[in-house]
């Protein structure tokens, strides 16, 4: 008993209780009891236990390192009671990702902050956590979300945090059947008017936009098969941009062809008449220096007082006259033809070239291309004018001869 106490006192080296300098003992220095300080946490009975005799001490919480930081504390120069032992900080675990000491645990970016009532209840429900994660992903604009939503129409009515993709919905079968029936009945003109669209919208309980979109797709997918079953060409009953471009180019080409063909029509009557088999008709139509007015005035009458489509009439007339008719019939027809409206071209032709320039016939704009459905009621009028002109030229030829 005395040996143990002396050993402890030798190891401590000072009767003070606030420090225990290492006086050569290999055991951890613990403060010894002091008779005048009842706050000491160790008693002589504990220090005299058999464990001390064997040179071992039980593990006890260490004293604060601040009390051992100075030499005075190590030497036990003060007899003040030791401060209460501070709470030992928990060992900081190493971060598996960074390999360094991690700080105090913070909530993860995907984890909802806990409320005071949920402190002991564990994490938030899984559904709310997933919704929050999807909302953050949608707000950050990740590439995967953009790639997935390329072929999906933007739904502005739904909230951004829902994260649910709007599935493609099909129209009701009753509504589709009504639209199909209307399409089959009007398959040759499958373009409903605004009133018909409104009526179909009421019958099918769909919006007008849905009806319009359905007809746009049906004309491209359903209508061609319907028309082929009837033996019709789908391109003739549908309007497309490609067909419109083709029709525009064909119309431009036709107009250019007509304009290029106009000079040939203007020159053919003179050459064909001179080349006719009857020499009596070819002689008066040949140009002569004695009567230049009649030769120069004739193109103005034919080209500027009639339509372009009738320019080939003198050519056919000259051929028919050159085959078998004689000039007596032409003279009789010319005498019986007494319309005053046709005397105006005759007067202009009898006068010289100076009067033709003053009358303004040469300044008239060229005629427009003829319509394919144009009425050819003026054909007989042109025939009569040509007969009268031929008779007059025959008389002039006889007088000059």
Swiss-Prot record:
SUPFAM superfamilies assigned: Homeodomain-like
Source organism per UniProt: Homo sapiens (Human)
Location of region: Disordered: 1-34, 78-127, 139-170, 274-293
Underlying gene: TGIF1
Name of this protein: Homeobox protein TGIF1
Disease named in the record: Holoprosencephaly 4: A structural anomaly of the brain, in which the developing forebrain fails to correctly separate into right and left hemispheres. Holoprosencephaly is genetically heterogeneous and associated with several distinct facies and phenotypic variability.
Assigned keywords, A-Z: Disease variant, DNA-binding, Holoprosencephaly, Homeobox, Nucleus, Repressor, Transcription, Transcription regulation
DNA-binding region listed in the record: 164-226
UniProt function note: Binds to a retinoid X receptor (RXR) responsive element from the cellular retinol-binding protein II promoter (CRBPII-RXRE). Inhibits the 9-cis-retinoic acid-dependent RXR alpha transcription activation of the retinoic acid responsive element. Active transcriptional corepressor of SMAD2. Links the nodal signaling pathway to the bifurcation of the forebrain and the establishment of ventral midline structures. May participate in the transmission of nuclear signals during development and in the adult, as illustrated by the down-modulation of the RXR alpha activities.
Cell compartments where the protein resides: Nucleus
One MF annotation (Gene Ontology) recorded for this entry: DNA-binding transcription repressor activity, RNA polymerase II-specific
InterPro entries: HD, Homeodomain-like_sf, KN_HD, TALE_homeobox
Entry similarity comment: Belongs to the TALE/TGIF homeobox family.
Motif (CTBP-binding motif): 153-157
Gene Ontology biological-process entries: amacrine cell differentiation; cellular response to growth factor stimulus; determination of left/right symmetry; dorsal/ventral pattern formation; fibroblast proliferation; negative regulation of cell population proliferation; negative regulation of gene expression; negative regulation of retinoic acid receptor signaling pathway
Oligomer status and interactors: Interacts with SMAD2. Interacts with CTBP, SMAD3 and HDAC1.
Pfam families found in the cross-reference section: Homeobox_KN
Location, primary (coarse class): nucleus
GO cellular component terms, A-Z: chromatin; nucleoplasm
């Amino acid at each position: 008993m005395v040996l143990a106490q002396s050993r402890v006192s030798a190891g401590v080296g000072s009767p003070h209780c606030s420090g225990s300098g290492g006086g050569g003992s290999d055991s951890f220095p613990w403060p010894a009891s002091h008779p005048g300080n009842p706050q000491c946490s160790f008693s002589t009975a504990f220090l005299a236990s058999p464990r001390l005799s064997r040179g071992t001490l039980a593990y006890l919480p260490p004293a604060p390192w601040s009390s051992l930081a100075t030499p005075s504390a190590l030497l036990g120069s003060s007899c003040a009671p030791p401060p209460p032992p501070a709470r030992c900080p928990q060992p900081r675990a190493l971060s598996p990702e960074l390999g360094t000491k991690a700080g105090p645990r913070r909530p993860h970016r995907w984890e909802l902050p806990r409320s005071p009532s949920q402190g002991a209840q564990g994490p938030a429900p899984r559904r709310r956590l997933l919704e929050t994660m999807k909302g953050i992903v949608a707000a950050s604009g990740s590439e995967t979300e953009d790639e997935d939503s390329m072929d999906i129409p933007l739904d502005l009515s739904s909230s951004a945090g829902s994260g649910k993709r709007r599935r493609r919905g099909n129209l009701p079968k009753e509504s589709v059947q009504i639209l199909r029936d209307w399409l089959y009945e009007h398959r040759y003109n499958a373009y409903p008017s605004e009133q018909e669209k409104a009526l179909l919208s009421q019958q099918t309980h769909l919006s007008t936009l849905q009806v319009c979109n359905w007809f746009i797709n049906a004309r491209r997918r359903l209508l061609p098969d319907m028309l082929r079953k009837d033996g019709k060409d789908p391109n003739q009953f549908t309007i497309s941009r490609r067909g419109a471009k083709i029709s525009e180019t064909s119309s431009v080409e036709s107009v250019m062809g007509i304009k290029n063909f106009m000079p040939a029509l203007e020159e053919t009557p003179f050459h064909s008449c001179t080349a006719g088999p009857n020499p009596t008709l070819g002689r008066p139509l040949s140009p002569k220096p004695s009567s230049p007015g009649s030769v120069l005035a004739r193109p103005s009458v034919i080209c500027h007082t009639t339509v372009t489509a009738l320019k080939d009439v003198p050519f056919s007339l000259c051929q028919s006259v050159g085959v078998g008719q004689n000039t007596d019939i032409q003279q009789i027809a010319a005498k019986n033809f007494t319309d005053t409206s046709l005397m105006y071209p005759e007067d202009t032709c009898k006068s010289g070239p100076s009067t033709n320039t003053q009358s303004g016939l040469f300044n008239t704009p060229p005629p427009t291309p003829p319509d394919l459905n144009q009425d050819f009621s003026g054909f007989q009028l042109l025939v009569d004018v040509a007969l009268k002109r031929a008779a007059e030229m025959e008389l002039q030829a006889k007088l000059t001869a």
